[in-house]
């Protein structure tokens, strides 16, 4: 999606008849996940299990810089589309391979869905309520999205090496596991040093305090971050809790982390004694590092975001699909949303006939045989 947002010609290749599973994630019968995350692409169907399907893929390759696949490792090789075959068709090809556990190793061919990786990576074990034995999974495809961002960066690195330094095409191996594991901070270093497994802290932090979400007297929630000593001190002083800084339990950042529960009790009481409006007045007047917890409703009503191009309504048939706008915003080469995710095989004729030169009869036969 990111490359397509900035003008790349991205062709989504799907299985004839069924298409990408994302098309089945519907809201009110509308595949909104597909509409948003498959935007700005072209869409063809192609069965690579069929010899003619593989031949068409190899014929297409020289027209493109990057091929991205997310099959279980070994699938391309099973169908005769190994790296040697692909680079023979296109020596400068960048092949980006996304999988759950990486392309090699004894576990590489296990099912590698994002939920499994979120469980296996340590993320779920360290996320959730410390008072509960139940680990917590994210409510959105975190591992998939993280690996996708790594894949985009890797493709650009490889293209830069090829086009600027005269390098060859190459294979990029991106695993969901390593992508998510890389976000967990110094977890391996902590374990190597202490041999202790980090436990769930809820909304608290191992690095600073106060940190958490606290309910107001009228039932709203405020998130607080004291991630630097001065931020924490200013927060406590602004809420009339400055005397806590004279208490050895809260005098330093290290002490505040060590006594996080006691600090939480004081902060919870201070925020809980005030309405959302009163808390916001203190936060804004003192430039505190705290903010109300917002839903999409509050985000759309936020005066700041109402002045920014955060959202865009994209025409799609008889409806508009509201979605997040292109980011990042570049001053000279801004991206754009040209279309929402399209229909299965919408560009078969344009690509197979106009660009690859298949005649109508040949394309009709391939369609009848389930090749496209």
Language-model region placement:
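Short, well-structured beta-strand/strand-turn elements
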Residues: 9-10, 284-298, 358-363
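Terminal low-complexity tails and localization/encapsulation signals of metabolic enzymes
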Residues: 198, 215-217, 298-372
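Short Pro/Gly-enriched beta-strand edge/turn motifs at strand-loop
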Residues: 18-19, 192-198
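N-terminal helix-loop segment corresponding to the beta1-alpha1 unit
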Residues: 1-165, 343, 347-372
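Oxidoreductase and adenylate-handling cofactor-binding alpha/beta cores
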Residues: 148-169, 182-193, 236-243
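Conserved Rossmann-fold dehydrogenase catalytic segment
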Residues: 103, 132-142, 163-180, 199-206, ...
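Glycine-rich beta-alpha junction loops
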Residues: 17, 101-102, 176-181, 218-220, ...
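Aromatic-enriched alpha-helical interface/lid elements that frame and gate functional surfaces
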Residues: 210-286, 290
